[in-house]
């Protein structure tokens, strides 16, 4: 049997992430992949990216991206071809944390499979999460054509690009084994009110921890939900909730969104 070609891809546009995130991602991959691998970043800014990363221009797109919660610019990766890579590729979000060996993500299932993480926030829907997913280059091209025909209509129907992939990938999708990928907000942070007393835990069998929406790894490391909140004590956070929005639901939502610092992130999310 031929050796599996280990190809990582990621995508970067705008100013939210950039070279620091790309470089950390490469370093985490290098520490957790056995043998040779490549990492290709499709980006609009190569400045500061370490030389081991193969930088390619963003795949061309003539689509006006819809107004939606979904990260629809990822659809650029559904093109029939991608510069510099072919065959199965493992896509990684720039803001995830790799905490264990990645080798299994390259040979799990069949080379032609589309494999996603499970989204634990909607357990009855069986929704996939594209924070870490594998697909053969070109297999999702039919989805790109459907999306191109009516971008806003598709976004209105599915909201998230990962729901569109889950429901429409040719041949269907598979999921990674549950223990491999953990969702920080729902599977690491203790439930309210214990999150005020217990720091987020790293499950022993987790290989990757994903950070959809908020918080981001650097904020979770410091113990805050978003940068604008600053570093608050328990008491300061509670008082902010009490003095905040008048609507009870918004106050309670703010009250629940509290984190203690998460030091294990620094152990893994580094160059």
Where do the PLM segments sit?
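A short, glycine-/small-residue-rich helix N-cap motif at loop->alpha-helix starts
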Residues: 62-73, 160
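Short, polar loop motifs at secondary-structure junctions
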Residues: 40-48, 100-102, 179-180, 214-215
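GT-A fold catalytic core of metal-dependent nucleotide-sugar glycosyltransferases
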Residues: 47, 54-57, 73-127
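Catalytic core and acceptor-binding pocket of nucleotide-sugar-dependent glycosyltransferases
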Residues: 141-271
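Short N-terminal binding/cap micro-motifs at the start of the first secondary-structure element
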Residues: 16-22, 124, 217-220
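Conserved catalytic core of nucleotide-sugar-dependent glycosyltransferases
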Residues: 102-168
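N-terminal anchoring/stem segment of glycosyltransferases
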Residues: 1-65, 82-85, 137, 257, ...
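Short, well-ordered beta-strand micro-motif
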Residues: 79, 134-136, 210
């Amino acid at each position: 049997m031929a050796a599996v070609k280990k190809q990582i891809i990621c995508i970067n546009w705008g100013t939210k992430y950039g070279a620091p995130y790309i470089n950390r991602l490469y370093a985490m991959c290098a520490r957790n992949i056995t043998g040779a691998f490549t990492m290709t970043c499709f980006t609009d800014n190569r400045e500061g990216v370490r030389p081991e990363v193969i930088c390619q221009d963003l795949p061309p797109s003539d689509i006006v991206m819809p107004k939606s919660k979904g990260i629809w610019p990822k659809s650029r990766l559904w093109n029939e071809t991608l510069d510099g890579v072919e065959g199965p590729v493992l896509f990684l979000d720039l803001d995830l944390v790799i905490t264990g060996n990645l080798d299994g993500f390259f040979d799990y299932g069949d080379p032609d499979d589309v494999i996603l993480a499970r989204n634990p926030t909607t357990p009855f829907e069986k929704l996939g999460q594209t924070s870490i997913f594998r697909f053969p280059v070109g297999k999702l091209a039919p989805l790109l054509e459907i999306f191109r025909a009516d971008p806003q209509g598709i976004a209105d129907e599915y909201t998230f690009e990962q729901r569109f992939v889950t429901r429409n990938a040719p041949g269907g999708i598979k999921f990674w084994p549950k223990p491999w990928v953990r969702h920080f907000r729902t599977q690491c942070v203790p439930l309210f009110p214990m999150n005020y007393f217990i720091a987020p835990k790293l499950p022993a069998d987790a290989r990757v921890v994903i950070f959809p929406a908020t918080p981001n790894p650097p904020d979770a490391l410091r113990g805050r939900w978003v940068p604008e909140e600053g570093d608050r004590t328990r008491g300061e956070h509670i008082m902010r909730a009490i003095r905040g929005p008048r609507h009870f639901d918004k106050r309670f939502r703010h009250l629940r969104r509290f984190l203690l610092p998460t030091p294990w992130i620094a152990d893994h999310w580094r160059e």
